[in-house]
Regions:
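N-terminal signal-anchor transmembrane alpha helix of single-pass membrane proteins
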Residues: 1-40
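N-terminal topogenic membrane-targeting module
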Residues: 24-120
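Amphipathic alpha-helical scaffolding segments comprising HEAT/armadillo-like alpha-solenoid repeats
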Residues: 68-72, 105-120, 141-152, 173-184, ...
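Polar helix-capping/helix-linker motif
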Residues: 73-81, 141, 154, 164
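Membrane-interacting alpha-helical segments
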Residues: 85-87, 117-120, 124-127, 286, ...
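Structural detector for internal amphipathic alpha-helices that build alpha-solenoid repeat scaffolds
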Residues: 90, 96-106, 128-139, 161-172, ...
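Short inter-helical turns and helix N-cap capping residues of alpha-solenoid HEAT/ARM repeat scaffolds
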Residues: 122-123, 155-157, 187-188, 219-220, ...
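Eukaryotic acidic, Ser/Thr-rich intrinsically disordered low-complexity regions
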Residues: 339-377
C-alpha cells in the first residue's frame, strides 16, 4: 500500500512540475513578445533623431548639449538601449554615415566606459552582447581596448570570439596585432573558421597584411597556418615574396605545407624553382602538394621533374604528379613515352589518372599497347 501511495504521489508531483513548466514557458514567451514590441516601438520613435545626429556629425558639426542629453537618456535605459543598438547596427551598413559612427559615439564615451565594470561581472550571454556592441560603436579608448583584451582570456569561447571580432571592428591595426600576439603566447583559441573570417576583414588592408606577415614568426604554429590560409584569399602581391622567403627558411612542416598551398592558389613565377626542389622533400606530404601545385607552373623543366616523381615511393605523390602532367600535356606521345619505360608504378598511376580524365584516349592507348603493358598485382 505504501508503494502505491508513493508512486501516486510521485506521479502527481511530476504532473504538477510539467504543468508549472508549461505555464512558465507560455508566460516567458508572452513577456518576450511584449518586450520586443516595446523595443520596436522605441526604435521607430528614436530612429530619425539618431540618424539626424549622425548626419550632423558627418558634416563636421558638433552635437548640442540637448542632443547629447537626449542620447544619454536613451543609453541609460535597457529597452531604449536595445533599440539604439539596433539602429547603430543598421547604420553601420549605411555608406553615408558608417565611417562617422565612432566620432558620434565618442560623445557618450563616459557612459559606455562606466558600464564596463558592470558587464565584466555578467554571465557570458550578457557580456557577449555588450562586447558585440562595443565593436559596433568603434570607439578606440584605453579602457575599452583593455577590457576587450581581458575578455580574450575568458572561459567562454563566445566571449573570446566576440572580443577579437570587436577589436577587429574597431579597426585599429596595432591593437589587433597586439591581440593576436597575446592570444598566441597564452595559447588562446577560437574556432578556426571564425578566426579566418575575422582575419579576412583586413584582406584589402595593405598595411595590416604587411604587419601580419612581419609577426608571423612570433605566432604559434596553428595561428601561422590560419593566417597563411587567409592570405590565399587576398591580392597583396608583396605577400608572395615574403612567403617564398619564409618557405626557404621555415622548418615546421605544417607551416611549410600551408605556404605551398598558398602558391598553388596564388601564381608566383619565382616560386616554381622551390616547388621543384620540394619534389625531393623528406616529407611525402610536401612532395604530394608540391606536385599538385606545379600544375599551375607547367614548363618543360617542370614536366621532366614530375616524370621523375611518377616513380616516387608514395602513391599520393605519384597520383598528383600524373594529374599535373595530364592536366597540361595529355598527349598520346607523352603517355607512350612513360609506358615504354620500365617503372611499373609510373605506368600504372598514369593509366589510372588517364582513365579518369580521358577515357577515350585511355581505351585507344590500352588497345594499341596492350601487349607492352604489365600491370602490378
Amino acid at each position: 500500500m505504501k508503494i502505491v501511495s508513493y508512486i501516486f504521489f510521485s506521479l502527481i508531483l511530476f504532473i504538477y512540475v510539467i504543468f508549472i513548466s508549461i505555464i512558465y514557458i507560455k508566460f516567458e514567451k508572452r513577456a518576450t513578445k511584449r518586450r520586443e514590441k516595446k523595443v520596436d516601438k522605441m526604435e521607430q520613435e528614436i530612429r530619425e533623431g539618431i540618424k539626424k545626429q549622425l548626419l550632423k556629425v558627418t558634416k563636421n558639426n558638433k552635437l548640442s548639449k540637448d542632443e547629447i542629453l537626449y542620447v544619454e537618456k536613451i543609453l541609460k535605459k535597457s529597452k531604449s538601449r536595445q533599440a539604439f543598438n539596433r539602429i547603430i547596427s543598421e547604420l553601420s551598413n549605411n555608406q553615408e554615415v558608417k565611417y562617422d559612427i565612432s566620432i558620434f559615439m565618442y560623445n557618450f564615451l563616459e557612459i559606455i566606459e562606466n558600464e564596463i565594470e558592470k558587464y565584466a561581472k555578467k554571465d557570458s550571454i550578457r557580456k557577449c552582447y555588450f562586447i558585440f556592441n562595443l565593436g559596433l560603436y568603434k570607439i578606440d579608448s584605453f579602457k575599452i581596448q583593455n577590457f576587450l583584451m581581458e575578455c580574450l582570456n575568458d572561459k567562454s569561447i563566445y566571449v573570446r570570439y566576440n572580443a577579437l571580432n570587436s577589436i577587429a571592428n574597431i579597426g585599429k591595426g596595432d591593437k589587433f596585432i597586439e591581440a593576436l600576439i597575446y592570444m598566441s603566447k597564452n595559447r588562446i583559441y577560437i574556432n578556426d573558421k571564425v578566426f579566418i573570417e575575422i582575419i579576412d576583414k583586413f584582406k584589402n588592408s595593405h598595411e595590416i597584411n604587411r604587419e601580419l606577415a612581419r609577426i608571423l614568426n612570433e605566432l604559434n604554429t596553428k595561428m601561422q597556418c590560419l593566417i597563411i590560409n587567409s592570405f590565399s584569399k587576398n591580392k597583396n602581391d608583396f605577400l608572395k615574396e615574403i612567403l617564398l622567403m619564409k618557405l626557404k627558411d621555415e622548418s615546421n612542416k605544417e607551416v611549410r605545407i600551408n605556404i605551398i598551398k598558398y602558391f598553388e592558389k596564388n601564381y608566383y613565377d619565382e616560386a616554381y624553382v622551390e616547388l621543384i626542389k620540394l619534389l625531393a622533400s623528406k616529407w611525402w606530404e610536401e612532395r604530394a602538394i608540391a606536385a599538385k601545385s606545379l600544375s599551375k607552373y607547367y614548363s618543360f623543366e617542370v614536366e621532366n621533374s614530375l616524370k621523375k616523381s611518377l616513380k616516387d615511393k608514395n602513391w599520393y605523390v605519384r597520383l598528383n604528379s600524373a594529374s599535373s602532367i595530364l592536366e597540361n600535356n595529355c598527349t598520346k606521345e607523352l603517355i607512350e613515352e612513360v609506358l615504354n619505360e620500365e617503372d611499373v608504378y609510373a605506368k600504372e598511376i598514369l593509366l589510372y589518372v588517364l582513365q579518369k580524365k580521358n577515357n577515350t584516349l585511355y581505351n585507344k592507348i590500352l588497345n594499341y599497347k596492350e601487349e607492352r603493358i604489365t600491370l602490378s598485382c
